[in-house]
Amino acid sequence: RGWGSDEKKDREEEXEQQ
């Protein structure tokens, strides 16, 4: 129940970088 939040943050950061 912790990696789920990490994955969402990673996806949001990737979209901003792209």
Swiss-Prot record:
* One cellular component term from this protein's GO annotations in UniProt: extracellular space
Expression sites by tissue: Detected in seeds (at protein level).
Does Thylakoid count among this protein's keywords?
A: no
- GO function terms (MF aspect): peptidase inhibitor activity; serine-type endopeptidase inhibitor activity; toxin activity
What are the record keywords, sorted?
Protease inhibitor, Serine protease inhibitor
Keyword Transferase included in the entry's annotation = no
What the protein does comes down to:
Inhibitor of serine proteases. Can inhibit trypsin but is ineffective against chymotrypsin, papain and elastase. Strongly inhibits the trypsin-like protease activity isolated from the third instar larva of P.truncatus, and also inhibits more weakly the trypsin-like protease activity isolated from the third instar larva of M.sexta. Protects the plant by inhibiting proteases of invading organisms.
Q: What is this protein called?
A: Trypsin inhibitor HSTI
Protein's organism: Mesosphaerum suaveolens (Pignut)
